[in-house]
Amino acid sequence: MDKEAVKKRIEELRALLHYHNYRYYVLDQPEISDAEYDRMLRELISLEQQYPEFITPDSPSQRVGGEVAKEFREVAHLKPMYSLDNAFGPEDLKEFDRRVRSLLPGQEVEYEVELKIDGLAISLVYENGVLVRGATRGNGTTGEDITANVKTIKAIPLKLRNPIPLLEVRGEAYMPKESFARLNEQREERGEPLFANPRNAAAGSLRQLDPKVTAERDLSAFMYAIGEVQGYEPKTQAELMEWLSELGFKVNPYREVFNNIDDVINYCQSWHEKRFSLPYVIDGLVIKVNSLAQQEALGFTAKSPRWAIAYKFPAEIAETRLKDIIVRVGRTGVLTPTAIFEPVSLAGTTVTRASLHNEDYIREKDIRIGDIIRVQKAGEIIPEVVEVVKEKRTGAEKEFVMPDTCPVCQGKAVRLPGEAAWRCTNASCPAQLKEGIVHFASRGAMNIEGLGPAVAELLLEAGLIHNYADLYYLSAEEVARLPRMGKKSAENLINAIEKSKQNSLERLIYGLGIRLVGEKAARDLAVHFKELDKLIAAGEEEIMAIPSVGPKMAASIKAFFAQKENLELIEKLKAAGVNTKYLAEVRDNRLEGLTFVLTGTLSSFTRKEAEQLILSLGGKVSSSVSKKTSYVVVGEDPGSKLTKAKELGIPILTEEEFRQMVMS
């Protein structure tokens, strides 16, 4: 390819990647699979590395993380970022309405109401449509320059779809609930301090001096306001939100306009329970005067706008009695104390246990068996013990002592210097083996259907397996003799194990359970090295050349493959016929021309897995039901999409019907 052809191809790839980024992260309507997107991004990065003169600040390649900063420099906002006054109930909202109307005598007032995302406020500046700066709110006048980090958030466009000379836009960076739970699970396994909630996780991720660390975290962002702007003058907040969406920003779909405060109050109260079904945390709603001319007339106090207020949800905390503290063992040997308490209802579910994380956590909070404790759900998803109600102690409470032996195998447990976690040192510990096998068989790894914790425990207790490689040497006859299995279940399990031999390399890499290596990194490693043997032979520098891999992960990968027993397991997998090479995606276009809408919770797939499956088979996924929708797939607790589908006469699929369509 000559230089002109290279330049043209780079521009074509950038345009395609910007388009598909917008479809996936903003519209929630992806048209291609992750694998196809990754292939285009790798081609772009490769071409830009060969021809660095063609790299531009708005290139999708610039999302992967730049140089490590020594510190964050301070930057001034073009216009101040104010905080909001709070309302804690209907009377506060009515008082806000009275103040607004008294300052706008004789005028009609509309309110635009939005969800209040619980994250980190950020400000972005675009010049001629290109992102040039990202900053934290800071003190409202100045903030910290986090440009390299915000570029890693794929919901933030590097280039606007309709460029204007200057735009300062404000929004909230956040971490989805599932991502927060997964991140804390990983940190707990590594003996690292946990984030208290998704807001802290988002803030901590964006304030990393190394952008590669931020890139590894699953962050997103909703935009909701502007500061300085040249080239556009919206008339209302509702119009502004539509315009931001047209520019390529992700804006929250849940927003309404009302002309009286009673309807505003009813709408706010309707979210008290509905919020728990959202994939992200909200801590209230924001009420804004809809007219921007009226906003300007109302102005600001020293701290906050007179035209907006935040309605805050009451904290949901329950008191209960701590019955016991048990210790569980994870796949890396980490001993985690767990609180067992009398049942309480939180965020719409009944809760009976919560992780106490480590010995230091218990000591800091002075938690004792028999205590009355206060419990909440961090990020509405993870139960946590907030505090002990010490004034209710009777003297019968018992202090908890962390065991220095593993509660499962009785092997020695140690706490290494600088770590908060105790670890079982016995590599043959049944608990570690079980968790390792369950991880190996999980959906994101080898996807062996029917091999969960109970079956893994049966296989280990019977002595049929001692590691995950042994799975490939099982017979249906052996498995059928296990309690509660039977011939049919045994045959299904063996068939699932046999089928997993043909998985692509990224699933195997993730299934090996290498510390710090998640699904995305496993895919990137597989695509880069193509063969497991090449990854094993690679040096740390070559591994670190992959955008999603940092120094700690590279060291962890090398340490894993330096262990003789791990290499022996890999040889055993090869001998059994397990694929160790990257398989290029084979196109099966059975769903070509079909558009699917998903509603409710699916039991066999996560939402993303179902979407990727549809895309990989040539179909499309939409976030809303219309006459163009081919099928609506319905899980548990479906929403209004099911009602709309029935009204339009759109075919409805149960989860089982969907499975048969895509898996047969």
Curated annotation (Swiss-Prot):
Gene3D superfamilies hit by this protein: 5' to 3' exonuclease, C-terminal subdomain, 6.20.10.30, BRCT domain, DNA ligase/mRNA capping enzyme, Helix hairpin bin, Nucleic acid-binding proteins
EC number: 6.5.1.2
Superkingdom to which the source organism belongs: Bacteria
GO molecular function, one term: DNA binding
Binding-site list for Zn(2+): C406, C409, C424, C429
GO biological process, one term: DNA replication
Domain BRCT: 586-664
Active-site residues from the entry: K116 (n6-amp-lysine intermediate)
Keywords: DNA damage, DNA repair, DNA replication, Ligase, Magnesium, Manganese, Metal-binding, NAD, Zinc
UniProt xrefs under SUPFAM superfamilies: BRCT domain (SSF52113), DNA ligase/mRNA capping enzyme, catalytic domain (SSF56091), Nucleic acid-binding proteins (SSF50249), RuvA domain 2-like (SSF47781)
Catalytic activity from the UniProt record: NAD(+) + (deoxyribonucleotide)n-3'-hydroxyl + 5'-phospho-(deoxyribonucleotide)m = (deoxyribonucleotide)n+m + AMP + beta-nicotinamide D-nucleotide
Required co-factors: Mg(2+); Mn(2+)
Pfam families per UniProt: BRCT (PF00533), DNA_ligase_aden (PF01653), DNA_ligase_OB (PF03120), DNA_ligase_ZBD (PF03119), HHH_2 (PF12826), HHH_5 (PF14520), Nlig-Ia (PF22745)
Binding site for NAD(+): D34, A35, E36, Y37, D38, S83, L84, E114, R137, E172, K288, K312
Classification via HAMAP family: DNA_ligase_A
Summary of the function given for this chain in its UniProt record: DNA ligase that catalyzes the formation of phosphodiester linkages between 5'-phosphoryl and 3'-hydroxyl groups in double-stranded DNA using NAD as a coenzyme and as the energy source for the reaction. It is essential for DNA replication and repair of damaged DNA.
Family membership: Belongs to the NAD-dependent DNA ligase family. LigA subfamily.
Name of protein: DNA ligase
Organism this protein belongs to: Carboxydothermus hydrogenoformans (strain ATCC BAA-161 / DSM 6008 / Z-2901)
Record lineage: Bacteria, Bacillati, Bacillota, Clostridia, Thermoanaerobacterales
Gene for this chain: ligA
